[in-house]
């Protein structure tokens, strides 16, 4: 696990509240120096692993409340290895954790593979990227401005 030495690079701080079923789990962590996302672990009971059948989806607890700083969001994203090797991904990706949310962060996993997948306690199930958020002033107009692209939608710019 990567632990940055320069604390100035970590500002602002991210405060976590550990829930009782998260006791004993490692804190979410950046696994390498260049990692954009911190890995989230499954807070399922050790004696009750969770099985996700092919085509099924389930919410997996992380055991933590995240106090995301104002002006930021937490983006829940799949782990590439789980997706490639097992067909396990996050159903709503990226899932947004708002800065004013104070409940437990849970991960919505879906099994797109052909075999049952067992989620065990402490398994790294997803990653969270903390990203800045811009809230826009919203105004209504009578028409859209003109651009070279215009209203061309899906596939309108071609492949090459």
From Swiss-Prot:
Keyword Cytoplasm belongs to the record: no
Family: Belongs to the dUTPase family.
Catalytic activity: dUTP + H2O = dUMP + diphosphate + H(+)
Pfam families: dUTPase (PF00692)
UniProt EC number: 3.6.1.23
One BP annotation, GO: dUMP biosynthetic process
Name of this chain's protein: Deoxyuridine 5'-triphosphate nucleotidohydrolase
UniProt keyword Signal present: no
Organism taxonomic ancestry: Bacteria, Pseudomonadati, Pseudomonadota, Alphaproteobacteria, Hyphomicrobiales
Keywords for this protein: Hydrolase, Magnesium, Metal-binding, Nucleotide metabolism
Residues given in the record as substrate binding sites: 79-81, 92, 96-98, 106
Gene3D superfamilies hit by this protein: 2.70.40.10
Role according to the record: This enzyme is involved in nucleotide metabolism: it produces dUMP, the immediate precursor of thymidine nucleotides and it decreases the intracellular concentration of dUTP so that uracil cannot be incorporated into DNA.
Cofactor needs: Mg(2+)
Protein's pathway: Pyrimidine metabolism; dUMP biosynthesis; dUMP from dCTP (dUTP route): step 2/2
Gene Ontology terms, MF aspect: dUTP diphosphatase activity; magnesium ion binding
Cross-referenced SUPFAM superfamilies: dUTPase-like (SSF51283)
């Amino acid at each position: 696990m990567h632990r940055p030495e320069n604390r100035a690079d970590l500002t602002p701080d991210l405060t976590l509240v550990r829930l009782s079923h998260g006791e004993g789990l490692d804190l979410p962590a950046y696994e390498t120096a260049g990692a954009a996302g911190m890995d989230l672990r499954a807070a399922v009971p050790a004696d009750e692993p969770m099985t996700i059948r092919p085509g099924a989806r389930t919410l997996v607890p992380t055991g933590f409340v995240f106090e995301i700083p104002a002006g930021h969001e937490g983006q829940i994203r799949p782990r590439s290895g789980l997706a490639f090797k097992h067909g396990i991904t996050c159903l709503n990706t990226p899932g947004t954790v708002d800065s004013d949310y104070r409940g437990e962060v849970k991960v919505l996993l879906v099994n797109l593979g052909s075999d049952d997948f067992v989620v065990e306690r402490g398994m790294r199930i997803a990653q969270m990227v903390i990203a800045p958020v811009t809230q826009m002033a919203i105004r209504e107009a009578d028409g859209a401005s003109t651009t070279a692209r215009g209203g061309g939608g899906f596939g309108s710019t071609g492949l090459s």
